[in-house]
């Protein structure tokens, strides 16, 4: 663990301190073009996130559900592709990669597929083959970063060429890695990597009771009742106060 952590820290600093050769000139003008093309209006924090990515080789974008992380990924993807930069999308799991593909319209791979590595029969991550495929990318965007553990992150930083951009996207309060380490959380707390935290829930996401209450739980706020929602809110969250086990099971089944 120590060797992997040390290598991750050293390699990330090398990536970050390497000359930024992907700087896009007339940044505000280019972003304005992307907003028009995608028919969106970036929030102040979203603009800041893309600006930080443009100015740094390594950057973290963090935020809960519905805070606009996917919009940032789509905007970055279009921005760099318009400037003939090769953007590679990946995620730790097949489901996350599929979701990333659906929301961006660009193929996203699992990290294992990207690195061309696989698990052995006993399914232990620590025994993954050390032969990995170099990552040919000007910009590498990793989604659901909270699920990436020490070993996988170590392979990623080894495979990424100096001069590439690395963008880590995720929610440190969600979906921790099965393997050792809390990479995303630790990197944020280190304050060594430029980080933009998104906290605004956008109107469409605010219609979901799951998203609103997920943020409330994180912030130590009570669940909000039906009367507090917008009229067109989705019926996707139910809070049932029941202490009797049999009645509780019945309530779950009846939903």
Model-derived features: where do they sit?
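Conserved helicase motor core of P-loop NTPases
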Residues: 172-255
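Hydrophobic positions on the alpha1 helix immediately C-terminal to the Walker A/P-loop
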Residues: 72, 76
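N-terminal pre-P-loop "Q-motif" helix
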Residues: 39-55
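Walker A (P-loop) phosphate-binding loop of P-loop NTPases
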Residues: 66
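Short hydrophobic/aromatic beta-strand immediately N-terminal to the Walker A/P-loop
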Residues: 59-62, 88, 167
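Interdomain "pre-motor" coupling segment immediately N-terminal to P-loop NTPase/helicase cores
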Residues: 1-26
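Conserved P-loop NTPase motor core of helicases/translocases
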Residues: 86-91, 95-159, 200-201, 210-211, ...
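Conserved lysine of the Walker
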Residues: 69
């Amino acid at each position: 663990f120590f060797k992997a952590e040390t290598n991750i820290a050293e390699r990330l600093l090398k990536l970050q301190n390497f000359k930024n050769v992907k700087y896009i000139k007339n940044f505000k003008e280019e972003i304005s073009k992307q907003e028009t093309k995608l028919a969106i209006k970036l929030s102040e924090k979203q603009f800041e996130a893309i600006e930080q990515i443009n100015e740094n080789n390594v950057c973290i974008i963090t935020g809960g559900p519905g805070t606009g992380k996917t919009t940032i990924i789509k905007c970055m993807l279009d921005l760099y592709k318009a400037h003939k930069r090769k953007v590679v999308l990946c995620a730790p799991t097949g489901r996350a990669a599929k979701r990333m593909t659906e929301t961006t319209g660009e193929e996203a791979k699992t990290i294992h597929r990207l690195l061309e590595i696989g698990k052995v029969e006993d399914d232990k991550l620590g025994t993954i083959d050390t032969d990995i495929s170099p990552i040919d990318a000007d910009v590498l965007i990793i989604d659901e970063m909270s699920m990436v553990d020490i070993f996988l992150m170590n392979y990623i930083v080894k495979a990424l060429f100096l001069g590439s951009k690395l963008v880590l996207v995720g929610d440190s309060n969600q979906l921790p890695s099965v393997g050792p380490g809390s990479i995303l959380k630790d990197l944020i707390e280190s304050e060594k990597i430029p980080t933009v935290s998104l906290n605004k829930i956008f109107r469409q996401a605010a219609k979901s009771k799951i998203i609103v209450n997920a943020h409330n739980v994180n912030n130590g706020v009570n669940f909000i009742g039906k009367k507090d929602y917008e009229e067109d809110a989705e019926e996707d969250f139910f809070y049932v106060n029941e202490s009797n086990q049999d009645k509780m099971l019945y309530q779950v089944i009846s939903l």
